[in-house]
Amino acid sequence: MTIGIVGRKTGMTRVFTDDGVSIPVTVIEVEPNRVTQVKTADTDGYSAVQITVGERRASRVTKSEAGHFAKANVEAGRSVWELRNNSQEAFEVGASLTVEAFSAGQFIDVTGTSKGKGYAGTVKRWNFGMQDATHGNSRSHRVPGSTGQCQSPGRVFKNKKMTGHMGAERVTVQNLEIVRVDAERNLLLVKGAIPGAPGGDVIVRPAVKARTNA
């Protein structure tokens, strides 16, 4: 059992069961996660574990970051992540978290950054219905239409669905099943799709709303 781990989405493939059933899976590469700081309720007001992954050139590490990594006696990673620790499990600075913390058949939640789609209209962004293709409609086929009333209330309500930037948001997909754990190659094979493009960092946690295969 673990509080979570940081990996990198590498792409999708499929695996076959003994019965010949094809299962689409996402491959997550998980380099050893190095613990850089352990936060406790006494010192920080809450319990959490700060980790780093990968490596970064020394010229790209700020002095404050270099001091932080040196204090933990770990190599500077490409970034730092923080995972809340609500369990009784104890972690030590400098320790490594690997894929062996998970097991096949376990359900997980995966958090990542969705693909950016740029500036999008309401039809694409919010699945609005289109207006008439003909019958007097010449240039308003994909226009959202009215955004509110007139004098009362005389404004557009907050959170009105309109055109704007689509994607590039933090997204969490819940209750994905781990099909296989490859400890030799540091890989997790997860059933289904996860957020983001290949090469993006993702956070893998035990499922909050865990379910069983029964």
Swiss-Prot record:
For this record, an example GO cellular component is: cytosolic large ribosomal subunit
Xref: InterPro entries: Ribosomal_uL3, Ribosomal_uL3_bac/org-type, Ribosomal_uL3_CS, Transl_B-barrel_sf
Which modifications occur after translation, per UniProt?
Answer: Methylated by PrmB.
GO terms for biological process, alphabetical: translation
Query: Is Lipoprotein given among the entry's keywords?
Result: no
What PROSITE patterns would the database entry show? Answer: RIBOSOMAL_L3
Annotated spans, Disordered: 133-155
This protein's record includes keyword RNA-binding: yes
Pfam families per UniProt: Ribosomal_L3 (PF00297)
* Record-annotated membrane-spanning stretches: none
GO molecular function terms noted in the UniProt entry: rRNA binding; structural constituent of ribosome
Keyword annotations for this protein, in alphabetical order, are: Methylation, Ribonucleoprotein, Ribosomal protein, RNA-binding, rRNA-binding
Alphabetized Gene3D superfamilies for the sequence: 3.30.160.810, Translation factors
Residues annotated with N5-methylglutamine modification? 151
The record's section on PANTHER family has: 50S RIBOSOMAL PROTEIN L3, LARGE RIBOSOMAL SUBUNIT PROTEIN UL3C
Instruction: State the family named in the UniProt similarity comment for this chain.
Output: Belongs to the universal ribosomal protein uL3 family.
Subunit structure and binding partners: Part of the 50S ribosomal subunit. Forms a cluster with proteins L14 and L19.
Q: What does this protein do?
A: One of the primary rRNA binding proteins, it binds directly near the 3'-end of the 23S rRNA, where it nucleates assembly of the 50S subunit.
Protein name (database record): Large ribosomal subunit protein uL3
This chain's source organism reads Cellvibrio japonicus (strain Ueda107)
